[in-house]
């Protein structure tokens, strides 16, 4: 008798994706982050759903409804902080996932990589709109500053901003539409994730050596399901530590003050996971130039496959490229730190140097060093 798992139309899809999927035998723990991202997405959707049951998207009651969730709803504070810190874990996994793709040359799977970039933009948009919902000072002013960037668009800039605001300033209409988009986008993200997996399973996964692994495959279950579960437990530990011991560690104290359009905070800054892009934006004195640099700082990932000059796909046996990638990581950490500092000397200069280094590394230095490494193969 044939197994229902392999014959039923629904279970057949699950079976070919997560059970009998042929996977390379040598993929390391760096490949765990895809499944961790899936777990984070599920956590965000579930906690978000429960928060939406008690939240009101109205400027007069939004702030107090969040306070009500934390004070009066059974375990509301746990749900709220799981959602807020879950977003931080989501982005941490995202950045590592992208970094692993760069290190091991996974960007050569172009469809999977491009859908991944679309996913990154969508998740960033969702997180930004979610940050506006508690309607604290940083929520309001963050929304004002970031949406105002669109006014740099030639000809239609002002109309575009007013269209997004639903008026002449960030107000009730803005909050309502941000809540609507914040609610629907995770489901759109889920659809994109399915397409991402579809394209990945068309080609098969990459591996640390960057060589074809068709000659040596193992079933996904039980080997990688157990491995992913270990990763999940190791992710839950820091998340729970954050939620139960210092839930506001990654937040901004200004967001515990209700939004006040008449009082600007001394330092407007987004959540930590946007600070690198925010630092790049601020390092350019021109408004339109800053906006373009901000967009290009993430969109640059799309042209990385075109800049691949190395003969080896993976960086595993390319020590110079490895060194440069870790310099890039250090540079991004520097940008993240700068994004959280005041706009004054010496932070302005450091931010500008770090921004120049970021683009130089990706566009010029790394492709050049890859060519040098190609020459070194003949020595």
UniProtKB/Swiss-Prot annotation:
Pfam families reported in the protein's UniProt record: Cytochrom_B_C, Cytochrome_B
List of residues binding heme b b566: 97, 196
Record keywords: Electron transport, Heme, Iron, Membrane, Metal-binding, Mitochondrion, Mitochondrion inner membrane, Respiratory chain, Transmembrane, Transmembrane helix, Transport, Ubiquinone
Cofactor notes: Binds 2 heme b groups non-covalently.
Residues that hold heme b b562 according to the record: 83, 182
TM helices/strands, residue ranges: 33-53, 77-98, 113-133, 178-198, 226-246, 288-308, 320-340, 347-367
Positions that bind a ubiquinone: 201
GO BP annotations listed: mitochondrial electron transport, ubiquinol to cytochrome c
MF (Gene Ontology): metal ion binding; ubiquinol-cytochrome-c reductase activity
Membrane topology: Multi-pass membrane protein
Localization: Mitochondrion inner membrane
Family annotation (InterPro entries): Cyt_b/b6_C, Cyt_b/b6_C_sf, Cyt_b/b6_N, Cytb/b6-like_sf, Cytochrome_b, Cytochrome_b_C_euk/bac, Cytochrome_b_N_euk/bac, Di-haem_cyt_TM
Cofactor: heme b
Gene3D superfamilies noted in UniProt: Cytochrome Bc1 Complex, Chain C
A Gene Ontology term for the protein's cellular component: respiratory chain complex III
Family to which this protein belongs: Belongs to the cytochrome b family.
Subunit structure as annotated in this protein's UniProt entry: The cytochrome bc1 complex contains 11 subunits: 3 respiratory subunits (MT-CYB, CYC1 and UQCRFS1), 2 core proteins (UQCRC1 and UQCRC2) and 6 low-molecular weight proteins (UQCRH/QCR6, UQCRB/QCR7, UQCRQ/QCR8, UQCR10/QCR9, UQCR11/QCR10 and a cleavage product of UQCRFS1). This cytochrome bc1 complex then forms a dimer.
Cross-referenced PANTHER family: CYTOCHROME B (PTHR19271:SF16)
Note: Heme 1 (or BL or b562) is low-potential and absorbs at about 562 nm, and heme 2 (or BH or b566) is high-potential and absorbs at about 566 nm.
Role of this protein: Component of the ubiquinol-cytochrome c reductase complex (complex III or cytochrome b-c1 complex) that is part of the mitochondrial respiratory chain. The b-c1 complex mediates electron transfer from ubiquinol to cytochrome c. Contributes to the generation of a proton gradient across the mitochondrial membrane that is then used for ATP synthesis.
Name this polypeptide is given: Cytochrome b
Organism for this UniProt entry: Indri indri
């Amino acid at each position: 008798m044939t197994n229902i798992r392999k014959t039923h139309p629904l279970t057949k899809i699950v079976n070919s994706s997560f059970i009998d999927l042929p996977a390379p035998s040598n993929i390391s723990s760096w490949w765990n982050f895809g499944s961790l991202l899936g777990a984070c997405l599920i956590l965000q959707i579930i906690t978000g759903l429960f928060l939406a049951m008690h939240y009101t998207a109205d400027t007069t009651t939004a702030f107090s409804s969040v306070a009500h969730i934390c004070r009066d709803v059974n375990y509301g504070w746990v749900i709220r902080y799981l959602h807020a810190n879950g977003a931080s874990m989501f982005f941490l996994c995202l950045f590592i996932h992208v970094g692993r793709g760069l290190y091991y040359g996974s960007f050569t799977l172009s469809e999977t990589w491009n859908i991944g970039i679309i996913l990154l933009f969508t998740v960033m948009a969702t997180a930004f709109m979610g940050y506006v919902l508690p309607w604290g000072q940083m929520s309001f002013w963050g929304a004002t500053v970031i949406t105002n960037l669109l006014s740099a668009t030639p000809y239609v800039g002002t109309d575009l901003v007013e269209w997004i605001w639903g008026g002449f300033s960030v107000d009730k209409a803005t909050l309502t539409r941000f809540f609507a988009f914040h609610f629907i986008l995770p489901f759109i993200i889920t659809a994109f994730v399915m397409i991402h997996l579809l394209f990945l399973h068309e080609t098969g996964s990459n591996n640390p050596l960057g060589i074809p692994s068709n000659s040596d495959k193992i079933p996904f279950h039980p080997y990688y399901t157990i491995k992913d579960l270990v990763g999940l437990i190791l992710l839950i530990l820091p998340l729970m530590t954050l939620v139960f011991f210092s839930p506001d560690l990654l937040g901004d104290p200004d967001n515990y003050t209700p939004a006040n359009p008449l009082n600007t905070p001394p330092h407007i800054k987004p959540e930590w996971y946007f600070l690198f892009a925010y630092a790049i934006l601020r390092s350019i004195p021109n408004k339109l130039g800053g906006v373009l640099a901000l967009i290009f700082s993430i969109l640059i990932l799309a042209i990385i496959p075109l800049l691949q000059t190395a003969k080896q796909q993976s960086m595993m046996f390319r020590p110079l490229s490895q060194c440069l990638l870790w310099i890039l990581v250090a540079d991004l950490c520097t940008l993240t730190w700068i994004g959280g500092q005041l706009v004054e000397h010496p932070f302005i200069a450091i931010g500008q140097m770090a921004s120049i280094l970021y683009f130089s590394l990706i566009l010029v230095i790394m492709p050049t060093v890859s060519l040098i490494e190609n020459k070194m193969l003949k020595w």
